[in-house]
Amino acid sequence: MAAKDVKFGNDARVKMLRGVNVLADAVKVTLGPKGRNVVLDKSFGAPTITKDGVSVAREIELEDKFENMGAQMVKEVASKANDAAGDGTTTATVLAQAIVNEGLKAVAAGMNPMDLKRGIDKAVLAAVEELKALSVPCSDSKAIAQVGTISANSDETVGKLIAEAMDKVGKEGVITVEDGTGLEDELDVVEGMQFDRGYLSPYFINKPDTGAVELESPFILLADKKISNIREMLPVLEAVAKAGKPLVIIAEDVEGEALATLVVNTMRGIVKVAAVKAPGFGDRRKAMLQDIATLTGGTVISEEIGMELEKATLEDLGQAKRVVINKDTTTIIDGVGEESAIQGRVAQIRKQIEEATSDYDREKLQERVAKLAGGVAVIKVGAATEVEMKEKKARVDDALHATRAAVEEGVVAGGGVALVRVAAKLAGLTGQNEDQNVGIKVALRAMEAPLRQIVSNAGEEPSVVANNVKAGDGNYGYNAATEEYGNMIDFGILDPTKVTRSALQYAASVAGLMITTECMVTDLPKGDAPDLGAAGGMGGMGGMGGMM
């Protein structure tokens, strides 16, 4: 086992604090409407330019191992805030730095670290309740656009796009961010249920100009099995032909003789058919087939529950107003399923989302909810260069997370004002002893840090602005973009409550642990080992020259 380097007490804390400050100082230059960019060197390709706090934090590793431990702990704050709310990483870092700096001063002055931590925790618990009380619901398009704009660093087009996307696909709808092809940002909305499986044979195409299959008011056959024998399907095909409607087959696979017969029937115009593979794999495929059945009012024909394809009737088939199938995707528009059944299915999947343990499962389940509930919107980010595209895409992603958080838990006044108001309301809070009271004061003083940093990045004097804001009440604050005071809600400067809450909770959690640190242990740096291999091994090569 390698030898360890151990530091105690103040020596350890000073090193740790230096690491905290290096990382936090790099991150906090990005805060606010006048925050600057940070350029990150990459081992290959062009450098990345970003204003995203967590991207900056992730890049930082320090040479001194004790300092690096401090930096890594603050990095954890940014990552946790990002995971919980998808935004507010810079605010969380600034709060953590403020709590650690103030807290360690108190420890150096002889306060008990454990009581300080208890005081900080008490203040944060009370602050979270106050934040919830200040929060107002965020339901209208205008508020959503404002939240998106602020999170995308005052880029109004991004805020408007996100609000428009949420209008189209609902608050629960899936909104994804992709690289665009032009200079402008675009919004594409896919209404109805779309899944990524295309037609099984190009001979099904009936719209050669678009290379797609479009079927009006088709029946939809859902089978959880491979179909290779056409005889199984004859009763259904005959019934559909009599009804004079087209048929879409969604099955595990359609192959061989069955596929050939369907193609021939379609080309001769006997019955219009199109076949696609069912989306997903394994259990997820079964679940998605059931989703489609609920949406279209059909039944999944599965041998597991004793149903056979030969005995299927028109009652077992789903229906939709229109189905569009191209090379890679199938879209079902206006399924005839009962609204109550669809809502029941959505509620069932939401329950699974609550119980899901992995992010991947949760994401897939949310996609299923969106497909049943409304549709999918794609924001295509436009930019002139690859570097700008990456930076802008990261901002749009942040803004999207922020708006989701706002819809979930509401909004509070932005620009660091909400935390200042909360701190003022908690001025009378006391702990069980004097050291806890100091801990409470440390937390309350730290709550001013985001406002001070926003002002500092705008080139103004933080103390003057902070005092002016504290003299006001309610949503009165400072708009750093226009350098004027007023009602933050009227200015459209809003922060999602969830983002502010998560930032404060994670910052206090990690900062509290750092304040109570008394000893740090790390590996000793390895000394340079004597390099015997190269010099020793090559000695015999000297004689080779004469042999040539």
Swiss-Prot record:
Look up the record and report any one GO term of the cellular component aspect.
Answer: cytoplasm
Chief localization: cytoplasm
Q: Which GO terms describe its biological process?
A: protein refolding
Q: Which UniProt keywords apply?
A: ATP-binding, Chaperone, Cytoplasm, Isomerase, Nucleotide-binding
Pfam families tied to this protein: Cpn60_TCP1 (PF00118)
An example molecular function term from Gene Ontology annotations: ATP-dependent protein folding chaperone
**EC annotation?**
5.6.1.7
Q: Where is the protein situated, by its record's location annotation?
A: Cytoplasm
Q: Where does ATP bind?
A: 30-33, 51, 87-91, 415, 479-481, 495
Catalysed reaction, written as an equation: ATP + H2O + a folded polypeptide = ADP + phosphate + an unfolded polypeptide
Q: Report the family membership.
A: Belongs to the chaperonin (HSP60) family.
Q: What does this protein do?
A: Together with its co-chaperonin GroES, plays an essential role in assisting protein folding. The GroEL-GroES system forms a nano-cage that allows encapsulation of the non-native substrate proteins and provides a physical environment optimized to promote and accelerate protein folding.
Q: What does the annotation say about its assembly with partners?
A: Forms a cylinder of 14 subunits composed of two heptameric rings stacked back-to-back. Interacts with the co-chaperonin GroES.
Protein name, entry field: Chaperonin GroEL
Name the gene for this chain: groEL
